[in-house]
């Protein structure tokens, strides 16, 4: 079965960045620690504009992603983050190939 990948790009209001960072930290950690089907949850920042945040999430399957979306921590993040962002876009992918990742 191919893994399901989600990329979400947020543009965060500058005055809300500190709170957004706290919220996404909680959500990312809860996702990888408590969801068996969440393999990866990376939070990336644009190197020139810290208000642009990219999430790179890898799940065992679309069903695992649906489980993620139903979780309390995800719902709380989405509700709390909504007033903090200027825009949000998402892209859904199927992982075709990935070489073995090195632990760093």
What feature does the model see in each segment?
Residues 17-19, 52, 64, 99:
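Intrinsically disordered, low-complexity acidic/polar segments
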Residues 43-51, 78-104:
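Glycine-rich beta-strand-turn "strand-cap" elements at beta-sheet edges
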Residues 8-9, 13, 71-72, 96-104:
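Short flexible/disordered coil segments
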Residues 4-34, 38-39:
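N-terminal first-folded block
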Residues 4-11, 40-69:
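Short, well-ordered beta-strand segments in beta-rich or mixed alpha/beta enzyme
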Residues 26-40, 58-91:
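An amphipathic, aromatic/His-enriched active-site/gating alpha helix that lines ligand/cofactor pockets
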């Amino acid at each position: 079965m191919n893994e399901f990948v989600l990329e979400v790009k947020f543009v965060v209001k500058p005055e809300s960045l500190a709170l957004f960072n706290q919220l996404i930290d909680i959500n990312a950690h809860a996702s990888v620690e408590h969801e068996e089907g969440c393999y990866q949850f990376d939070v990336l920042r644009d190197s020139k504009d810290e208000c642009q945040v990219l999430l790179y999430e890898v799940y065992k399957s679309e069903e695992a992603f649906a489980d993620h979306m139903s979780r309390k921590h995800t719902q709380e993040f989405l509700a709390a983050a909504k007033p903090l962002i200027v825009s949000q876009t998402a892209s859904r992918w199927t992982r075709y190939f990935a070489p073995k990742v090195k632990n760093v």
